[in-house]
């Protein structure tokens, strides 16, 4: 379905795992943590414990690298029954810091597609992402994509209220905005609930806390290649 008959004014993009790879870096750190804790626990136990710790910390710490790092250390203390050494703690902290520096190279077709959307001039392009402000700003800057966007908003959670607030800030109705993202839970479901159009582009890895049941909707289109956005929005 093309959206040419709709009064679309804004195209909003998620950042992590939509514009650049992110989750695989976290998965690599999780695996290295498992190696460090081998004397005390299996990789499966470390992974299960980390997920439970992250979920338990979510209300206080929210999403982002710093929250992940705290959970990484907290889980390690639990897994080792307090026997963890200072050297391992320092290594875990350094692994967490590495997630603030990894290269945010654009995923296939992202840069070219954004350039064509930008050059077309009919749509306002914005980034709507979840996490820590400084970290997300740094990732966008490192990606080399910042020049395509007129606005970036980073929130602690993506729910219906946040989508309504974004539309109000941009001066558009929900049915005048398209949300593009990889997470059905954060990028698609709440956007659909408030009346936005959505484009779902799944990624090959999904964070455990982002998994949810998917469903069809008349305002939802699912794509496998980023450049398909151009056809949906009738950009040549």
Say what each PLM segment does.
Residues 39, 48-98:
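A metal-dependent, Asp-based hydrolase signature
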Residues 93-112:
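Long amphipathic N-terminal alpha/beta scaffold segment
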Residues 2-49:
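Active-site neighborhood of HAD-like aspartate-dependent phosphohydrolases
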Residues 103, 125-126, 137:
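N-terminal cap/leader regions of alpha/beta-hydrolase-fold enzymes
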Residues 1-8, 111, 115, 119, ...:
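Asp-based, Mg2+/Mn2+-dependent phosphohydrolase catalytic module
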Residues 32, 36, 40, 113-122:
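A short, Lys/Arg-enriched amphipathic alpha-helix followed by its capping loop at the start of a domain
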